């Protein structure tokens, strides 16, 4: 086996780079594409349905479900990035004394995740995530020993599906 055989095994001729990506959630504005530091494409799961027959089990396909989606966001001094998620979450369920909440058509949004080739211009994969809304706007860590770092926080979003 030669090194060339390894690279030939990948039809595009190159490996995907996990650091060449952008996340666009148009509801949060253009700047979010630069504030989203990390994410993963959410898992799609088809549960199995075990069916027993005469001491044997066969597995049939069940329903498709989708895991929640988590993004890591770089915070800014004005806390605008985090506040946008808090405000979005408040559309689904308010934080005050009153019980408030919008309709799904008001709080469910879409996102696009794009992965790029090494030239950082050619889109190699694009996934659209539908029915998003933030279920958990993560904590902000404060620590006197955290020098030379950018503050980040995680947001977990529920979703309906991706394509």
From Swiss-Prot:
Keyword vocabulary terms for this entry? Late protein, Viral contractile tail ejection system, Viral genome ejection through host cell envelope, Viral penetration into host cytoplasm, Viral tail protein, Viral tail tube protein, Virion, Virus entry into host cell
Q: One Gene Ontology cellular component annotation?
A: virus tail, tube
The principal localisation class reads virion
Q: What is a biological process (GO) this protein takes part in?
A: symbiont genome ejection through host cell envelope, contractile tail mechanism
Q: Which domain of life is it from?
A: Viruses
Its annotated compartments are: Virion
Molecular function (GO) terms for this protein are: structural molecule activity
Q: Which family does it belong to?
A: Belongs to the T4-like viruses Gp19 protein family.
Q: What does this protein do?
A: Structural component of the bacteriophage tail which consists of a contractile sheath, a tube and a baseplate. The central cylindrical segment of the tail consists of a rigid tube, composed of multiple copies of the tail tube protein. During infection, contraction of the sheath drives the central tube through the host outer membrane, creating a channel for DNA ejection from the capsid into the host cell.
- The name of this protein is Tail tube protein gp19
Q: Which organism is it from?
A: Enterobacteria phage T6
Report which gene this protein is encoded by: 19
């Amino acid at each position: 086996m030669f090194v060339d055989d390894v690279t030939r095994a990948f039809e595009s001729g190159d490996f995907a780079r996990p650091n060449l990506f952008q996340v666009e959630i148009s509801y949060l504005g253009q700047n979010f594409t630069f504030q989203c530091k990390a994410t993963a494409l959410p898992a799609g799961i088809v549960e199995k349905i075990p069916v027993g027959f005469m001491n044997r089990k066969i597995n049939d396909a069940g329903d498709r479900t989708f895991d929640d989606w988590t993004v890591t966001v770089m915070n800014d001094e004005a806390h605008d990035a985090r506040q946008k998620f808090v405000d979005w979450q408040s559309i689904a369920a308010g934080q005050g004394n009153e019980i408030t909440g919008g309709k799904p058509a008001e709080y469910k949004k879409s996102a696009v995740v794009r992965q790029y080739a090494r030239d950082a211009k050619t889109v190699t994969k694009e996934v659209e995530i539908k029915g998003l809304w933030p279920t958990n706007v993560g904590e902000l860590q404060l620590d006197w020993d955290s020098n030379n770092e950018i503050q980040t926080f995680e947001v977990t979003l529920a979703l309906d599906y991706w394509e």
